[in-house]
């Protein structure tokens, strides 16, 4: 029996994961996690498991969404359409 997804936090990044953000040796996700820690955000595995154990995260790269490449835009539109009305969507931009 699968559990229903009740909340998804969509984190939009202007930089693809795997590319560095002015910090050699760190990828975009690691740098953004560092920014969150500086602001007091806590990413405790125990909290994640208790809050949403079956879905850890979704990251959408804005640089792909707002270009002429139609595939990422279509995937974004499909995700929003699928979630609308069934899930509370919380938007985050870094």
Swiss-Prot record:
Superkingdom of origin organism: Bacteria
Protein name per UniProt: Uncharacterized protein HI_1493
């Amino acid at each position: 029996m699968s559990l229903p997804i009740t909340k998804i936090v969509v984190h939009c990044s202007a930089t693809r994961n795997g590319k560095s953000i002015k910090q050699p040796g760190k990828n975009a996700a690691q740098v953004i996690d560092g920014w969150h820690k500086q602001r007091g955000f806590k990413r405790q595995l125990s909290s994640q498991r208790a809050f949403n154990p079956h879905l850890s995260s979704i990251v959408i790269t804005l640089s792909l969404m707002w270009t002429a490449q139609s595939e990422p835009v279509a995937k974004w539109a499909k995700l929003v359409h699928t979630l609308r009305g069934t899930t509370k969507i919380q938007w985050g931009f870094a």
